[in-house]
Amino acid sequence: MEQLQAVIENAFERRAEITPRNVEANLKESVAQVINMLDTGKLRVAEKINGEWVVHQWIKKAVLLSFRMEDNSFIKGGFSNYFDKIPSKFADYSSRDFRDGGFRVVPPAAVRKGSFIASNVVLMPSYVNIGAYVDEGTMVDTWATVGSCAQIGKNVHLSGGVGIGGVLEPVQASPTIIEDNCFIGARSEIVEGVVVGENSVISMGVYIGQSTKIYNRETGEITYGRIPPGSVVVSGNLPAENGRYSLYCAVIVKQVDAKTRSKTGINELLRGI
């Protein structure tokens, strides 16, 4: 693995020079190996080690290099045709492959090769980009998008129209992470490497990036970039010091433990705010 990483790191330093016509065979093979391991879940861009998320930047660099190495090509689809650098994850799938994968894909969901879909995942008509990791039992609802290299935990519900930001455009240092057992309400956007802690509930229409103020109603504390585990979050506003205007923020209205979260419906948690 160290040798593979070295090839990727060295090539990334001269990425501006790389084209589909001059890419070395060794580099092309190395990047393809990384993409295939991402596709099968043997590698992931970020993983939790000793309770902390660790980002493997070299894997993200391999994903970025794949765009430099490939020309657009014709991609045949069931309802249309496409022209892109990255093939569909399911381009060569048979019915047995789908059964072995243990997930369900509703047309016209689009999933790029190099993303991992675990068992018992349901993909409604949605989009999952390269490098993403979608763990067991998660629902990606209609028109939801899972951005490049985003990490989605177990038993997560991404409601209709949810946007989970990627790392490729614009380039971000860390992927957006939604931990286990989270509910993300319809049309919410979580981007720019924000981490949503496990067992959290994000209400409908909440937008959180790295510059979004996250206000804890109980403590009065303002933080950025991370939602603590067990948080119930709604959209809100904070007044300016001069009182002449207010700016958008995300408000943590309560925090619940995993036991309460498992016994309480989403509507109940949001209704009593």
Curated annotation (Swiss-Prot):
Chief location bin: cytoplasm
Catalytic activity: (S)-2,3,4,5-tetrahydrodipicolinate + succinyl-CoA + H2O = (S)-2-succinylamino-6-oxoheptanedioate + CoA
InterPro entries: DapD_Trfase_Hexpep_rpt_fam (IPR005664), Hexapep (IPR001451), Hexapep_transf_CS (IPR018357), THP_succinylTrfase_dom1 (IPR023180), THP_succinylTrfase_N_sf (IPR037133), Trimer_LpxA-like_sf (IPR011004)
One GO term of the biological process aspect: diaminopimelate biosynthetic process
GO CC terms of this entry: cytoplasm
Enzyme kind, highest EC tier: transferase
EC numbers on record: 2.3.1.117
Assembly and interaction partners: Homotrimer.
The name this protein goes by in its record: 2,3,4,5-tetrahydropyridine-2,6-dicarboxylate N-succinyltransferase
Organism: Nitrosomonas europaea (strain ATCC 19718 / CIP 103999 / KCTC 2705 / NBRC 14298)
